[in-house]
Each structure stands twice: as structure tokens, then as C-alpha cells.
Regions:
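Short, basic alpha-helical/linker "hinge" immediately adjacent to a nucleic-acid-recognition surface
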Residues: 1-89, 93-98
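Mobile genetic element proteins and their domesticated derivatives, centered on retroelements
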Residues: 13, 37, 81, 95, ...
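Charged alpha-helix within mobile-element recombinases
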Residues: 31, 82-87, 216, 250-253, ...
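Short conserved beta-strand segments at catalytic cores or DNA/RNA-binding microdomains
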Residues: 174-194
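Active-site beta-loop-alpha junctions of metal-dependent nucleic acid enzymes
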Residues: 175-178, 195-218
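Acidic/histidine-rich, metal-coordinating catalytic segments
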Residues: 220-235, 257-259
Length: 321
């Protein structure tokens, strides 16, 4: 006898299909006959023959209420969207993009409206556009360009290092009011982030060794590095030496013009994202290495519109396979 499925069972069918499970295995999991699962898939798949849980639920509810083309979103979808906002800090555009790749079509403005209609106030603080960034002022003023020996200007950087080529990096530090610093690096084409607390503050030689250690596993894919004129990067020739590969052109560190943060926009944007989790008034002593690594992993798993809503991690490591 045919039994009407509920939303949770449809979601289990959707997950089972995505995992490649057989119809019989899916049927056993939700305690129905295989014929019920087959009927559900045939009846509620989309025009491309894909079975998507929330679309299937909407079609069922539309038939149930006699509303042809009913486009109301099931409550389960809103619960999932809430989790994406609260747990992952994803923007409506990122959520709409990721759901769209799953065949679930929802406009980012619809998600914004949902957030603004939330009377509990739980959702709004997690939206990126709710953050208010002021212009970053470092505890120590940038070193004048003339004080960095053997400095190579950004104006000598090759034209192909335009942010589209894989292997061009930017680096910077974020600081607190207690003299602590965190090194940040990003690969420009994928926005992949590396970060680590600097145990000796902004001393040039220890900073150079940390940069080289973080980039060493990927040194074959380090073509250029761009940074500002901070005193912590004065030992840039040590970075070049430590990342050198015999028979290949040496990695050059290029320095932006003083007070021209737009010349290294990728790392500036990365730092803003990091500040979501490490606010400016923080004491970095409160952030363990493990906690900083969790922040790095979270940002690298975050979908980006620039990457067609893929993650920096996926786009970065596809170059190694």
C-alpha cells in the first residue's frame, strides 16, 4: 500500500541518491517499499531528472493544497539556511550560489528578506555586510620604503601577476594592542589563506622564516609575493633564499607603494574576513594555534562568488592533482 512520505524521508532519499545508494538501501533506511521510493523519484524529480529534496517537498505541498506551481519554500530549507548563516557566517549570495549548484533555486534577496524578518536577532550579526570596518591603523607605522634594503617595487612586478595566474601571493600582518602579530598570506587567484601567530612579534628574520615555512610545501607554486613596507618584511631576501628551487627563477618579494593598500587588495580583504573572528580589540594571547587553524580552515571552506561558489581550498588544491 502506498504511503505518503514526509519531508524527513524525502531528505533521506535526496542524501541517499547523492551518496550513490541503491533504491533498496534507501527504502530500508526510511522504512518503506522500494516501489515507494521509485514512485517518489519519478514523480518529484525536476526537469533535468534530478531529485532535489526541497523542490520535491514544494511540489508535493503544491499538489496537496491545490496550488499549481506553488513556490513556497519548506521550513526545512529555512532551517538549513539559518544554519549556514549562524555556523558558517555565509552571506545570502554565497548561500544562494551553493544551493543553486544543488538544484535548489532561491534568490539572495529572498534570503536577505528572511534575515531582516527574523525577530530573534540571531541571524543579522552573522552577515558579512553587517560588519563595519574602519580603515586599518597598525600599532607600528609602516617602514618608509627607503629603509628596506634591496627593495623591489611593485612597479617592477611582471604584468602576468594580475591576480588571475595561479601562484601569485600577498602577505601582511594583523596586530593587537599588546605587541602581538599574526602573519597572513593569500594566493591571489583562489583566495586560499594561510595564517600563523608570530611568536617573536614583528621581528624581521623570524617573520621571514615563518613565511618560508608556511609556503615551503607549495614552493613550486610560489611565483611572486607582494606586501607592504612593514618593518617585519625587511628580511625579504631570506624569504627568497629559503624558497629557491635550483634551476628556477627565484621568488621575488615586491613592495607596494607606501600607504597604497589597494595595491594588495587580496590580503586586505582576507584580513577583513579574519577580523570577523579576531576583532581589533582582541588580545592574541587568547587565541591558541589550534583556534587560529580552525579560523583558517573555516575561511578556506567558505564559498566565493569569484570562484563560482566553490571554496578556496578546492580551487587551490586542484592545481596539485
Amino acid at each position: 500500500m502506498y504511503k505518503q512520505l514526509i519531508s524527513e524521508q524525502r531528505y533521506a532519499i535526496y542524501l541517499g541518491i547523492k551518496r550513490g545508494n541503491s533504491i533498496r538501501k534507501i527504502a530500508r533506511a526510511i522504512e518503506v517499499q522500494p516501489s515507494t521510493v521509485l514512485r517518489e523519484i519519478r514523480r518529484n524529480s525536476n526537469a533535468n531528472g534530478e531529485y532535489v529534496w526541497c523542490n520535491a517537498q514544494s511540489k508535493c505541498m503544491g499538489r496537496k493544497h491545490g496550488l499549481k506551481g506553488n513556490h513556497r519554500k519548506p521550513q526545512e530549507l529555512w532551517w538549513r539556511i539559518d544554519q549556514m548563516i549562524i555556523e558558517n557566517d555565509w552571506s545570502p549570495a554565497q548561500i544562494a550560489g551553493v544551493l543553486g549548484k544543488e538544484g535548489i533555486h532561491i534568490a539572495k534577496q529572498t534570503i536577505y528578506n528572511h534575515v531582516h524578518a527574523d525577530t530573534s536577532g540571531r541571524l543579522r550579526p552573522h552577515l558579512p555586510h553587517e560588519l563595519r570596518y574602519t580603515r586599518r591603523v597598525k600599532a607600528l607605522r609602516p617602514t618608509k620604503a627607503t629603509n628596506i634594503a634591496n627593495r623591489t617595487s611593485i612597479h617592477e612586478r611582471p604584468a602576468e601577476a594580475d591576480g588571475k595566474r595561479f601562484g601569485d601571493w600577498e602577505m601582511d600582518t594583523i596586530v593587537d594592542s599588546f605587541g602581538h602579530a599574526i602573519l597572513t598570506l593569500t594566493e591571489r587567484s583562489t583566495n586560499f589563506i594561510l595564517m600563523e601567530k608570530l611568536k617573536q612579534g614583528r621581528k624581521a628574520m623570524p617573520t621571514a622564516k615563518t613565511v618560508a615555512r608556511l609556503l615551503f610545501p607549495y614552493r613550486e607554486h610560489v611565483l611572486t609575493i607582494t606586501t607592504d613596507n612593514g618593518c617585519e618584511f625587511a628580511a625579504h631576501l631570506e624569504i627568497t633564499r629559503l624558497l629557491s628551487i635550483r634551476g628556477r627563477e627565484k621568488v621575488t618579494v615586491f613592495f607596494a607603494d607606501s600607504y597604497c593598500s589597494l595595491q594588495k587588495g587580496a590580503i586586505e580583504n582576507a584580513n577583513k574576513l579574519i577580523r570577523k573572528y579576531i576583532p581589533k580589540k582582541s588580545n592574541f594571547d587568547d587565541f591558541s594555534d589550534a583556534k587560529i587553524m580552525r579560523i583558517q580552515k573555516k575561511l578556506n571552506a567558505r564559498p566565493r562568488e569569484k570562484l563560482n561558489f566553490d571554496s578556496p581550498k578546492n580551487c587551490f588544491f586542484m592545481h596539485f592533482y
